[in-house]
Amino acid sequence: MERKKFSSKFIHLLIVFLLLCTFLSRTESALPYHHELFLGRKRMNYYKPNSAIGTPSSTSDHAPGSNGRKLMSIYRPNGDIFTGPSGSGHGGGRTPAP
């Protein structure tokens, strides 16, 4: 009788532990960024520190023998984007600094 009681409690404890682990793993992925420091984990799956947005890779099919363009060494989000005057009449353009 004592053995059945022990195994029953052990099975219940194991089920509760597995449910708790499942719950924590699902809610952890939905936490905001500042909670990552609290949990001690970094979720930087899609972060590429040395790549620019929207630029082709250094090797391309149309330029054999060349190493491609040299990318910016410092990332500047809108550093080289200059737009002309807007045709809609709502402004929207900025002129490049001399």
UniProtKB/Swiss-Prot annotation:
Motif SxS motif essential for MIK2 binding, which positions? 58-60, 86-88
**Is tRNA-binding included in the keywords of this UniProt record?**
no
Q: Which UniProt keywords apply?
A: Apoplast, Cell membrane, Cleavage on pair of basic residues, Membrane, Repeat, Secreted, Signal
**Signal peptide limits:** 1-29
The source's domain of life comes to Eukaryota
Subcellular localization is given as: Cell membrane; Secreted, Extracellular space, Apoplast
Q: Give GO terms: molecular function aspect only.
A: LRR domain binding; receptor serine/threonine kinase binding
Task: Please provide, in alphabetical order, the Gene Ontology terms of the cellular component aspect for this entry.
Answer: apoplast; plasma membrane
* Tissues in which the UniProt entry reports expression: Mostly expressed in leaves and seedlings shoots, to a lower extent, in roots, but barely in flowers.
Major location (coarse)? membrane
Q: Region entry Disordered: which residue ranges?
A: 50-98
Q: Pinpoint motif SCOOP motif 2 by residue range.
A: 80-94
What does the subunit comment say? Interacts with MIK2 (via extracellular leucine-rich repeat domain); this interaction triggers the formation of complex between MIK2 and the BAK1/SERK3 and SERK4 coreceptors, and subsequent BAK1 activation by phosphorylation.
Tell me the protein's name.
Serine rich endogenous peptide 10
Q: What is the source species?
A: Arabidopsis thaliana (Mouse-ear cress)
Lineage of the organism:
Eukaryota, Viridiplantae, Streptophyta, Embryophyta, Tracheophyta
